[in-house]
UniProtKB/Swiss-Prot annotation:
GO cellular component: cytoplasm; extracellular region
Xref: CDD domains: humanin
Classification via InterPro entries: Humanin (IPR028139)
Protein name according to UniProt: Humanin-like 3
Induction summary: Down-regulated 6 hours following staurosporine (STS) treatment and up-regulated 24 hours following STS treatment. Down-regulated 6 hours following beta-carotene treatment, while it is up-regulated 24 hours following beta-carotene treatment.
Origin organism lineage: Eukaryota, Metazoa, Chordata, Craniata, Vertebrata
Location relative to the cell: Secreted; Cytoplasm
Single GO BP term: negative regulation of execution phase of apoptosis
Pfam families assigned: Humanin
Biological source species: Homo sapiens
Record-stated family: Belongs to the humanin family.
Expression sites (tissue/organ): Highly expressed in testis. Also expressed in kidney, heart, skeletal muscles and brain.
């Protein structure tokens, strides 16, 4: 369960990073 939560966090962070890069 912990690993799944970590993977979800990584996915969310990657999505945020992509959105930030798009803004720039």
């Amino acid at each position: 369960m912990a690993t799944r939560r970590f993977s979800c966090l990584l996915l969310s962070t990657s999505e945020i990073d992509l959105s930030v890069k798009r803004r720039i």
